[in-house]
């Protein structure tokens, strides 16, 4: 049996070696072949001869299924697979860009490039047009800005929530990236 840096028994998902307390087990050897139902002593001896661990894979089966393997390597591979899975999960964020009804062309283009970058990275984009003072009387200008943004980004995005009404002193639209 190899010496394995052992976590506390309560934290370990599988029982190994002498922790297995049954009379007989269904054994799978290190090559993945069925060795049949054997006594626990015989299974431990086979694991010791192979200089590996006896790991209880399925404790609820009758008799429990045990496998001869390197437990440290098994835990490492399991952890590595979990990390890889976590890495593949993308958390979608909502990025916000604020416009004003009188946003100049140069500023508009800079903000548009930022929106394109956000959408290409897979994030959602929240476009807000804020009105101050007398601008509230010309809400149509702000809605035209949102319409222009929507048209400029139509190829790479889809409108998730359109600016139907004002929320206080601002009009809001949310764009999501198109599925590839």
UniProtKB/Swiss-Prot annotation:
A Pfam family per the record: IF3_N
Biological function: IF-3 binds to the 30S ribosomal subunit and shifts the equilibrium between 70S ribosomes and their 50S and 30S subunits in favor of the free subunits, thus enhancing the availability of 30S subunits on which protein synthesis initiation begins.
NCBIfam families found in the cross-reference section: infC
Main location: cytoplasm
Gene3D superfamilies to which the protein is assigned, alphabetical: Translation initiation factor 3 (IF-3), C-terminal domain, Translation initiation factor 3 (IF-3), N-terminal domain
One of the protein's GO biological processes: ribosome disassembly
Gene for this chain: infC
MF GO annotations: ribosome binding; translation initiation factor activity
Keywords for the protein's UniProt record, in alphabetical order: Cytoplasm, Initiation factor, Protein biosynthesis
Cross-referenced InterPro entries: T_IF-3_C_sf (IPR036788), T_IF-3_N_sf (IPR036787), Translation_initiation_fac3_CS (IPR019813), Translation_initiation_fac_3 (IPR001288), Translation_initiation_fac_3_C (IPR019815), Translation_initiation_fac_3_N (IPR019814)
PANTHER family: TRANSLATION INITIATION FACTOR IF-3, TRANSLATION INITIATION FACTOR IF-3, MITOCHONDRIAL
Organism: Pasteurella multocida (strain Pm70)
Family: Belongs to the IF-3 family.
Protein name: Translation initiation factor IF-3
Domain of life: Bacteria
A GO CC annotation given for this chain: cytosol
Quaternary context: Monomer.
